[in-house]
């Protein structure tokens, strides 16, 4: 269970990194497309078409943010109930709350663009929290994994 | 390796703690999973269902007088609601729908055609004529149904799969008969799997001329549509050139067939002659203003070819324009105005033909967005009066009623609201009363945080959709219905005909 918990926490952190990457990828594609004379407005946005490839960044961001990350955070929270480590539930809950807040702030950005800035800031908080949540768990296997290479390196050939 | 140290305490206490350690996580998990599973299960739709069984009845403050059931005893079927069955047709139109690859702006795009083209043929008739459209579906796999957007046709002819008819499968036919009872600019489009089918071009223009014709010398219908990201007018990428002599007056009938609002502006002053097929009363000249044309809406713009040999541009968004003037006459792209024409105060007041103050029904249509499950899918979904699909309101009226609807967009995105079978007149926006020409709409742009008070006369019995014309939103459940007491539909959503109106 600890392994699952640790992996899930790291996946949340990795997902935050992916979210940041695909969004900037999409914006870069948009800027390049507009630079080439393209018009991006509500009709194009809602047409379901992909006028430039990087639109997939927005689609991935939306699917990840709405479904995938909340689902992983929820499974992490449930896993934490069975992880007999002090603070595991607390940190899973912090991650979960930050994920929920991140989604709400993101949608709020549709109305108040400044919320988008907070969305970016909260992403850093979420990344840090998720990364720490994974890192603070010492699994039964990890000491072995950490020690073995050292032993091997120290052994003269 | 984990070493458990023996804690002090009695054996009973330790066993109790162990039990708790096992039970508490399970209980916490159950507390999270069970409500989610229940919500998921409750949102799943049966294999076939009637819109009459969906959601809850809203009598608009009027006493509930037809029992608790949506289905009243001895209800009339909407299939009876047809146009003058004994009258021969004045105009016969044959339409064949196909699923094929479209060539748009040098690109190949999977889409749909009507009589071999997209958009389909422009149907142009005179007011008062009885139109008979013979539809044959040749190859559209999901089936088709044609909706006459903006014309208040009899309910059985409204073309909504699963509500007023079954989707027409490949090889089958359906005949639409209706009287073009009002002059104006309209359009037709599929209302079966409407989001992909409309996006794929299963649509066309429908123009009804007044018996005496129109005053303008140039009359052009311009359907703006985006095919796979390519902006077009009447199916051609780029600008539409219309040859005309200097000094000619023109009426450009613009239809926005996309899912989002579009701005329209011109290179010289213009008048907005009509909105959604209804003439504006005493429209004045406009300059430095753009007209916001919401999804599904139409605007008739009147302007004049300049006398100096140049052309006039009518911009349909920044991307495309109708250019009218002598052959090869040029005109620079006019800058997009920062302000939009406010229809709340445009034109001059006139009588409405009914008294909104005497409304017997008052409905709320409050749009929100919240997390939940729709059709078994988790997500952030549009809500109507706080409810998610299918727990949407069924607004109930009786023939002859005057109804008021308070439409309020509490979400953060624009919604083009479309009521079938009726025209709504705008009474107020954000509480500010309308002072201009009667502003009649069938497709209303309700921006984020805006509210509208509209009124309509219940003069067209049946069961009607009242939905967002961002068809993606409709497919995600942003659909309510309006029903007249004493009517029922034999059609079902899904079921053997696989009716999927959105």
Label for each model-derived stretch:
Chain A
Residues 1-157:
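Polytopic transmembrane helical bundles with strong interfacial aromatic enrichment
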């Amino acid at each position: 269970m600890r392994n699952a918990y640790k992996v899930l926490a790291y996946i949340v952190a990795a997902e935050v990194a992916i979210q940041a990457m695909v969004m900037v990828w999409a914006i870069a594609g948009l800027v390049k497309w507009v630079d080439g004379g393209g018009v991006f407005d509500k009709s194009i946005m809602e047409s379901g078409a992909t006028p430039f490839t990087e639109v997939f960044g927005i689609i991935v961001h939306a699917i990840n943010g709405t479904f995938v990350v909340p689902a992983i955070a929820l499974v992490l929270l449930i896993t934490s109930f069975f992880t007999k480590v002090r603070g595991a539930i607390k940190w899973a809950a912090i991650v979960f709350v930050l994920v929920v807040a991140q989604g709400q702030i993101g949608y709020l950005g549709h109305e108040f663009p400044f919320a988008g800035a907070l969305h970016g800031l909260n992403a850093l908080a979420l990344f840090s929290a998720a990364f720490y949540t994974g890192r603070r768990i010492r699994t039964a296997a990890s000491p072995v994994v950490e020690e073995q290479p050292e032993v091997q390196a120290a052994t003269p050939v | 390796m984990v070493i458990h140290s023996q804690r002090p305490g009695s054996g009973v206490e330790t066993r109790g703690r162990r039990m708790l350690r096992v039970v508490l996580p399970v209980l916490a998990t159950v507390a999270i999973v069970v409500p989610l599973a229940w919500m998921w299960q409750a949102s799943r739709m049966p294999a076939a269902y009637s819109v009459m069984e969906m959601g809850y009845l809203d009598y608009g403050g009027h006493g509930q007088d037809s029992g608790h059931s949506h289905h009243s005893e001895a209800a009339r079927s909407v299939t009876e609601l047809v146009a003058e069955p004994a009258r021969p047709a004045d105009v016969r139109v044959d339409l064949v729908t196909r699923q094929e690859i479209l060539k748009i702006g040098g690109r190949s795009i999977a889409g749909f055609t009507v009589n071999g083209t997209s958009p389909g043929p422009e149907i142009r008739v005179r007011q008062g004529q009885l139109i008979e459209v013979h539809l044959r579906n040749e190859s559209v796999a999901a089936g088709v149904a044609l909706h006459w957007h903006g014309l208040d046709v009899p309910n059985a002819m409204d073309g909504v799969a699963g509500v007023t008819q079954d989707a027409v499968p490949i090889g089958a036919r359906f005949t639409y008969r209706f009287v073009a009872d009002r002059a104006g600019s309209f359009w037709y489009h599929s209302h079966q799997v409407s989001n992909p089918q409309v996006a794929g071009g299963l649509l066309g223009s429908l123009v009804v001329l007044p018996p005496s014709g129109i005053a303008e010398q140039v009359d052009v219908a311009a359907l703006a549509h985006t095919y796979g990201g390519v902006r077009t007018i009447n199916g051609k990428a780029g600008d539409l050139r219309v040859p005309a002599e200097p000094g000619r007056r023109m009426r450009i009938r613009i239809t926005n067939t996309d899912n989002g609002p579009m701005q329209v502006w011109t290179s010289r002053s213009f008048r907005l002659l009509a909105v959604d097929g209804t003439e504006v009363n005493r429209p004045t000249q406009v300059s430095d203003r753009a007209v916001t044309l919401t999804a599904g809406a139409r605007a008739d713009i009147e302007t004049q070819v300049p006398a100096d040999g140049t052309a006039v541009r009518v911009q349909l968004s920044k991307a495309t324009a109708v250019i009218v003037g002598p052959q090869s006459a040029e005109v620079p792209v006019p800058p997009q105005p920062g302000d939009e024409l406010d229809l709340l105060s445009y034109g001059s007041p006139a009588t409405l033909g009914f008294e909104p103050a005497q409304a017997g029904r008052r409905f709320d249509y409050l749009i929100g967005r919240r997390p939940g499950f729709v059709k078994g899918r988790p997500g952030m979904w549009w809500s109507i009066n706080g409810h998610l699909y299918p727990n949407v309101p069924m607004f109930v009226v009786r023939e002859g009623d005057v109804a008021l609807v308070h439409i309020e967009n509490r979400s953060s995105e624009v919604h083009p609201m479309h009521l079938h079978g009726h025209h709504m007149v705008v009474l107020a926006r954000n509480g500010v009363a309308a002072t201009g020409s009667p502003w009649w709409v069938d497709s209303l742009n309700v921006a984020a945080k805006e509210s509208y008070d509209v009124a309509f006369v219940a003069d067209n019995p049946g069961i009607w959709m009242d939905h967002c014309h961002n068809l993606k939103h409709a497919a995600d459940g942003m659909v309510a219905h309006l029903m007249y007491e004493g009517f029922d539909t034999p059609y079902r959503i899904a079921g053997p005909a696989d009716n999927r109106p959105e």
